[in-house]
Each structure stands twice: as C-alpha cells, then as structure tokens.
Amino acid sequence: MYRIKDLREDRDLNQAEIAKIIKTTQQQYSKIETGKSDISGEKLCLLAEFYNVSADYILGLTDELKPLK
C-alpha cells in the first residue's frame, strides 16, 4: 500500500493541497490515497520530489526513508 497518506498527514497537509502539487483533482487524489486507483509514474515522481523520498519508499518497497539525491 502507498505511504502517501502518512506522508501527507505528517506534514499537516490536506488532500486538495497535494492534488494541486501533482496536477490532479482532490477526488482523484483521494482514490489514489485509498488504493482505489493506481498512481501514474509522473505523479509518483512528483510526490517523491515533493516529499524528498524515494518512489520505492512511497510504494512500500523499502522501509528506508532515504532522501532523494
């Protein structure tokens, strides 16, 4: 499962704010966050850059919270 909800909540942001960053609607972002819709590679990269974490961390493929270089 994606870790985007935890990342968002840790920064006290709402879904609409993140949706704007990844150029989508709040409704679509909500579907991504709840696993009802897949995230595109482009949106995944935008989130990784915004949160300064790896895409693997967001996708739950690693537990290492490594910042992007």
Please name every model-derived segment.
Residues D10, E49, L59-K69:
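Short, charged recognition helix plus adjacent turn
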Residues K23, E42-Y57:
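DNA major-groove recognition helix of helix-turn-helix/homeodomain DNA-binding modules
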Residues K36-L46, L65:
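Short, basic-rich loop-to-helix N-cap that marks the start of a DNA-contacting helix
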Residues D12-K31:
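Short alpha-helical DNA-recognition segment
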Residues M1-D10:
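A short, Lys/Arg-rich alpha-helix, primarily the initiator
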